[in-house]
UniProtKB/Swiss-Prot annotation:
Name of the gene: rpmC
Gene Ontology biological-process annotations: translation
Coiled coil location: none
Organism of this sequence: Corynebacterium efficiens (strain DSM 44549 / YS-314 / AJ 12310 / JCM 11189 / NBRC 100395)
Protein known as: Large ribosomal subunit protein uL29
A Gene Ontology term for the protein's cellular component: cytosolic large ribosomal subunit
GO molecular function: structural constituent of ribosome
Classification via PANTHER family: 60S RIBOSOMAL PROTEIN L35/50S RIBOSOMAL PROTEIN L29 (PTHR10916), LARGE RIBOSOMAL SUBUNIT PROTEIN UL29C (PTHR10916:SF0)
Alphabetic keyword roster: Ribonucleoprotein, Ribosomal protein
UniProt xrefs under Pfam families: Ribosomal_L29
Matches recorded under InterPro entries: Ribosomal_protein_uL29 (IPR050063), Ribosomal_uL29 (IPR001854), Ribosomal_uL29_CS (IPR018254), Ribosomal_uL29_sf (IPR036049)
Amino acid sequence: MAIGTPAHEFRELNEEELVNRLNEAKEELFNLRFQLATGQLTNNRRLRTVKRDIARIYTVIRERELGLSVVPGAEA
């Protein structure tokens, strides 16, 4: 079963929301790596999930730059 946020949910967000989600995910990844280094991390799988979410967000942003995907609410 897939864990994390599916790409279609990211595609429904506008540019500002995507950037906010990206910043939150990067901050969470930083905190998880810090916990791993100090031996406090209990869920190692979360690292992988957050990294994949970050990659999905970057993919959606790049699709929009290339015109492969449309921004929701934007008039064509």
